[in-house]
UniProtKB/Swiss-Prot annotation:
Keywords: Protein biosynthesis, Transferase
Catalyzed reaction equations: L-methionyl-tRNA(fMet) + (6R)-10-formyltetrahydrofolate = N-formyl-L-methionyl-tRNA(fMet) + (6S)-5,6,7,8-tetrahydrofolate + H(+)
Protein name: Methionyl-tRNA formyltransferase
Recorded family membership: Belongs to the Fmt family.
Biological source species: Clostridium botulinum (strain Alaska E43 / Type E3)
Record flagged with keyword Protein biosynthesis: yes
Protein role: Attaches a formyl group to the free amino group of methionyl-tRNA(fMet). The formyl group appears to play a dual role in the initiator identity of N-formylmethionyl-tRNA by promoting its recognition by IF2 and preventing the misappropriation of this tRNA by the elongation apparatus.
Entry keyword Transferase: yes
Amino acid sequence: MKIVFMGTPDFAVPSFRKLIEEHEVKAVLTQPDKPKGRGKKLAYSPVKEEALKYDIPVYQPTKLKDDKEIIEKLKEINPDFIIVVAFGQILTKEVLDIPKYGCINLHASLLPMYRGAAPLNWVIIKGEKKSGNTTMLMDVGLDTGDMLLKEEVEIHEDMTTGELHDILMISGGELLLKTIEGLCSGSIKPVKQEGETFYAKMLDKELAHINWTEDAYDIHNLVRGLNPWPIAYTEYKGERMKLYKTKVLYKEVSNKPGTIIEVNKEGVKVACGKNVLIIEKVQFPNGKPLTIEQYINGHSIEKDIILGE
């Protein structure tokens, strides 16, 4: 099958490789090169780097909907499918109508739940027990197209967004291959998205600031959901303290929320609006992430200090 692939970050690369192995990828569309690092040198997207290894033509529209030259090129290619994995741009009807079998999107949630830009984060922040990938036939809406195939994964109580990302990143490629095969054979029938939904909006930095009046369970989910980025944080004696790993102690205490009630090598116990949060791994300014056992070897964390003040 002739395929045009549209994708940008690491998440899209394994799917791209699978398509190269099984089909004829005629072109790649990815986001423009962006300044990176202290030197602000232009850096290629992970998908562009991969495409160049295979000498596949790469196009980088700032806004595809306004780029008539690239749209005409897509029409010349006349692909059977356009496959989209975390491309980062909305496709117009003109582009959606180009491929013979349609545009397929791999979305990292069990649609219709968690449409939007940050499904991996929000599914964990909300404390869900399962997630997965969904393939869908794209329409002009945002993640609203007819569903094709789904694949579920369990979310264990300590799983981070980074860990879920890596699982779904690898499994997504196989799901795309099955979807292409099923559409070509007629064995897959598109299903309308109906029922409850939740929009997984882009993350903002304010979300990362911990509110200790909340239940420790919800704070734990926030910590997991914001790891590896942007990382949930609080303040200890005026210094920013980032939380990388926590667990919940289901125990009622009378201390003011945010109060450190115990410190040992297993962790820092903090009173919350409900239950107790045990902080197991932290990072302070100019330091690297350390377990509490590592950190208290050379530094002190004092009992009775109130975090966030």
